[in-house]
Amino acid sequence: MLFLRFFIFTFFTSIFTVVVSEPPVSAKFAKRVLSATSSSSSTCPEFITIFSEGPSEYITTIYPSSKSSGRGTTNHSTIYTTINSGTVASTYTVTLADGDVVVKDIEPTAGTVTTTITSGSHEFTTTLAEASGTVPGTVEVVEPLAGTVTTTIHSGSVEYNTTLATASGTVPGTVEVVEPAVGTVTTTIYSGSEEFTTTLASASGSISGTVEVIEPTAGTVTTTIYSGDQEYTTILAEASGTVPGTVEVIEPAVGTVTTTTYSGSVEYTTTLVPASGSVSGTVEVVEPAVGTVTTTLQSGSQAFTTTVPASGSVSGTVEVVQPTGGTVTNTVYEGSQTITSTLATASGTVPGTVEVILPGPSTIYSGTVATTITYDVSSTPASTVVVIPTAVCNGERGLQYAVYNYDISSSKNQFCATSGVTDVSSFTQPAYFGSSDLDQSSPLFTGVLSSSDSVPQWTSSYNLPGYPPDATAMGSTSSACKVIVYQFFFRVPVTDTFSLDVTNVDDVFYGWFGDKAISGWSNTNYDTYAYWHATNGQTGIASFSMGSLTADTYVPVRFVVANGAGKGGFDFSFVDSEGNSYNPTSYAYTATCTESFLPFGQGNGGVDN
């Protein structure tokens, strides 16, 4: 910034006056007068023009006070002056002569406009002293300056350093040293949106307390105290042009009681930081989210929803439980305990591997009746990939069923013969209707036979049995080339030896019991089998010994009944050692408190080996 220097020469018998008024600069300069010329040829010039050297050349016009005697030309004069801020002229008398003219130092004038360098980033003006009489007030013009290390009094309680401007070339960056203020009322720039006042230090004796006035502002990097227990940084406003964005630094608060919203359904309290001296501990109060739908991943294959009831004006919480997608589970039969082990953790789109260890069979089933097949415990169960879901305790009492079309291409022409008789021996893949090979998106009919329904007897008929919920439609559908899959838990009514009796089989019946009836049931590990005899037209019968069973225990049971051409049907019952027959639907359950069946369709636990 350049200021023109005006020199006024007043001549009194070879004497002239110099008035100097210069801007605020903190150093002493020497100005070399290059030349001085008169405006006329008279003995006393009207004015003298002085050309001086400096960072920037400028012209100063000097007016004599009168046309008294004086010289009109001064060459190579040197003026020494002290540059300082002032608005009031000082007058000095020097002798006018050829050659050099020496001007004495100019003293600063009080009450002038001055400029102070500070470390802030905003320019402002403040009045330090008010005008009094003829003495003007002092005005302080505060301007930001780059490349200077300064100290600013700040209302916070922590001292830190921050660089406002990055160094460029030989110009150093600006470093702001922030120190806490003691005993003063100050204002701190804060990135929040609420204005408030807090006392950081109480008054002591003649020293006043420190009061912190918090004001919101934009475009400043600040620190906010937050009641959570995680530290993070977020940008509230993006930078625009030369205006920087607002960055909010969130820090955990120490020694306060805070509340965190949690998406679960359980409320609890935990202490994160123990109390120490006068500092209270941090207590985290975890509350369930109000009216929030949350999703929990579970390794089963059943999706269900549970509702936490609303209370007063608080809406209920809905928890949606979904099966884990793409989880590969391997079932291994060994040992006597059921355990689950994760072999590989899921990564990105690659599913993890979960290994489910099931106890090996502990009961040897045997029998001497026709068509009964006995398996030794040393038999190795088929290797498979299955998922066993967690059961719910309030399983619906009843028996589940599903009806499919017989669509095994390799045997359909023989089993579903349009002429002649059904080749019952061609149906050797019962597990197909519960395996991943099944080529039907959903069953034709499915439902539950509850305890209020009759025994699921399928009297030999050209149509399917009329089971609920759509008994009319199902009962009017042809039974030709159809397969019905049944699954249920048999609750043992009394402690005794039981058997399963199957009668009126038309055309083929397969049965599985125990854990393999839930998953791992295959084309070769069935426990009982019966079929229609083409030679004499007699329906199939079978009796399978289930061994000694304990009252109120649950036995998993699965049946597959298939009909080729013509009529179809079958009937069954559970019989104790005294010959008492038990209604299957009265003692059948869809699930227990620890087990449940997989849904019908692909992945129903079948192994089409």
UniProtKB/Swiss-Prot annotation:
PROSITE patterns registered for this protein in UniProt: PA14
Region called 9 X 36 AA approximate tandem repeats, residue ranges: 75-391
Keyword Glycoprotein on entry: yes
Signal peptide region: 1-21
Broad class of the protein's primary localization: other
Protein purpose: May be involved in agglutination during conjugation or other aspects of colony formation. Induces flocculation when overexpressed.
Similarity comment: family membership: Belongs to the mam3/map4 family.
UniProt protein name: Putative cell agglutination protein pfl4
Organism for this UniProt entry: Schizosaccharomyces pombe (strain 972 / ATCC 24843) (Fission yeast)
